[in-house]
From Swiss-Prot:
Superkingdom of origin organism: Bacteria
Annotated protein name in UniProt: Cysteine--tRNA ligase
Cellular location(s): Cytoplasm
Chief place where the protein resides: cytoplasm
Originating organism: Lactobacillus delbrueckii subsp. bulgaricus (strain ATCC BAA-365 / Lb-18)
Family note: Belongs to the class-I aminoacyl-tRNA synthetase family.
HAMAP family noted in UniProt: Cys_tRNA_synth (MF_00041)
Annotated cofactor note: Binds 1 zinc ion per subunit.
Keyword Ligase: yes
Keywords: Aminoacyl-tRNA synthetase, ATP-binding, Cytoplasm, Ligase, Metal-binding, Nucleotide-binding, Protein biosynthesis, Zinc
Length: 474
């Protein structure tokens, strides 16, 4: 299996620290609002990656944090007239509800920054003791230039970074920082009513970057197999995590850095973000869109690529999902009949070849498009066999099992996909289908067509097969 490592800008063979196990940390949300689909994209991308590791037999220790104290949270809590903890609790629960709806597996652990304050203080003190950090008027800053590899992950040199930093430092910070490029590890309390904790440097709260260094190393060890997040976190967040963690431990922090692409909107494909006010929340989308369709839409694009959110692209995803559903229904319908099966060597070979193609694609940095193409190209032959006079039932049964496993990697629940919503008119539909079957048996084509038209007006789609007529709702 090969992964594209952002640190080296190339694909590398995946070699876990512990054979058969994967340690994986993914930056979670800052919980001051409902998540939008840009946030969901990251959660779905890394859930798909996790699921494929599990498909391959790995045990995955998946840690994803909640940033539950932050400038944005303080501002939002003030605007709403509530407290930061109350705001955090509300949106953590909303996040969990949204991710459950999208069939995102629960993390092994969801640490919260505010629950790790003692560990954060100890981590910062170690950096001070080693000369990598310094206190200034109640704040603590990291000496970025002291870390020799600073800028490596984002492929920037110190001069470039310093020039950019000097343009964003306010006068107050300038007076405290030794260098514009230095970043905050601890922020002193600015107002008496601002959320804060006691520390050796006075009351205050942690900086964003130190939170993830502490939580990832505390729960996964000094060196991680994989660290993931959005491409917008590459710098400064992940760059700073490396500087902090490796300065403290003296060890390589992460072996494989994975970054997912953005969700864009509109004809200009503008990045979706809260700051640009062009976002749509998962909560609002799911009022009108099937969760499985949204999940499949997000999971069906390779994680490093951008996704353009549009009604047309959602509809296309729904159509592809419908093809998979029809194939599974056709197989199940055929397996349920009493006809004797007939082995088909070509179909058996196709199942084996499709499995190999699917896994080869996913082993190539999780190339989901090629994996889906392999499945999609197998459907005509599978459908043809399912409708044949004598089907290869064993191969069909195996393909259905494989397809369920493949779709599960994409986060789809086959049982839910195949579940029919019971309607008050089901019995009426069954009776009309039976009457049409009898009319066809008697070659009363006019009556058959009349019944088909009547069923169509009821929103019922018919499919005639050698084994009988199947129906579904539009």
């Amino acid at each position: 299996m090969k992964l594209f490592n952002t640190l080296t800008r190339q694909k590398e063979e995946f070699k876990p620290l512990v054979p058969g196990q994967v340690s994986m940390y993914v930056c979670g949300p800052t919980v001051y609002n409902y998540i939008h689909i840009g946030n969901a994209r990251s959660a779905i991308a890394f859930d798909t990656i996790r699921r494929y590791f599990e498909y391959k037999g790995y045990k995955v220790n998946y840690v994803s944090n909640f940033t539950d104290v932050d400038d944005k949270m303080i501002n939002e809590a003030g605007a709403e007239g509530t407290t930061v903890p109350e705001l955090a609790e509300r949106y953590i629960q909303a996040f969990l509800e949204d991710t459950r709806a999208l069939n995102i597996e629960e993390a092994t652990l969801h640490p919260r920054a505010t629950h790790e304050i003692p560990a954060i203080i100890d981590f910062i003190q170690t950096l001070i003791d080693k000369g990598y950090a310094y206190e200034a008027d109640g704040d603590v800053y990291y000496r970025a230039k002291k870390f020799a590899d600073y800028g490596h992950l984002s492929d920037q040199n110190i001069d470039q970074l310093e020039e950019g930093a000097s343009q964003h430092v306010n006068d107050e910070e300038q007076g405290r920082k030794e260098d514009p490029i230095d970043f905050a590890l601890w922020k002193g309390q600015k107002a008496a009513d601002e959320i804060a904790w006691d520390s050796p440097w006075g009351k205050g709260r942690p900086g964003w970057h130190i939170e993830c260094s502490v939580m990832s190393t505390k729960y996964l060890g000094d060196t991680l197999d994989i660290h993931g997040g959005g491409q917008d976190l590459e710098f400064p967040h992940h760059e700073n995590e490396i500087a902090q963690s490796e300065a403290k431990t003296g060890k390589k922090f992460v072996n494989y850095w994975l970054h997912n692409g953005f969700v864009t909107v509109g004809k200009d494909e503008e990045k979706m973000s809260k700051s640009l006010h062009n976002f749509v929340t998962v909560y609002d989308i799911l009022k009108n869109v099937d969760p499985q369709v949204l999940r499949f839409f997000m999971a069906s694009v390779q994680y490093r690529s951008q996704i353009n959110y549009s009604e047309e692209n959602l509809e296309q995803a729904a159509n592809i999902l419908g093809r998979f559903k029809n194939t599974l229904e056709g197989i199940n319908y055929r397996l349920a009949d009493a006809t004797e099966g007939l082995p088909d060597p070509d179909l058996a070979k196709l199942v084996t070849e499709t499995t190999a193609k699917f896994e080869a694609a996913m082993d190539d940095d999780f190339n989901v498009q090629n994996a889906l193409t392999a499945i999609y190209e197998a459907l005509p032959a599978v459908n043809s066999n399912a409708n044949a006079e004598k089907a290869d039932k064993e191969s069909l049964r195996l393909f259905a099992k494989k397809l369920a496993a493949w779709l599960s990697v994409f986060g789809l629940d086959v049982d839910k996909l195949l579940a029919k919503e019971a309607g008050d008119d089901d019995a009426v539909i069954e009776e009309l289908v039976a009457q049409r079957t009898e009319a066809r048996k008697n070659k009363d084509w006019a009556k058959s067509d009349e019944l088909r038209d009547q069923l169509k007006e009821m929103g019922v789609v018919l499919k005639d097969t050698p084994q009988g007529t199947r129906w579904s709702r539009e």
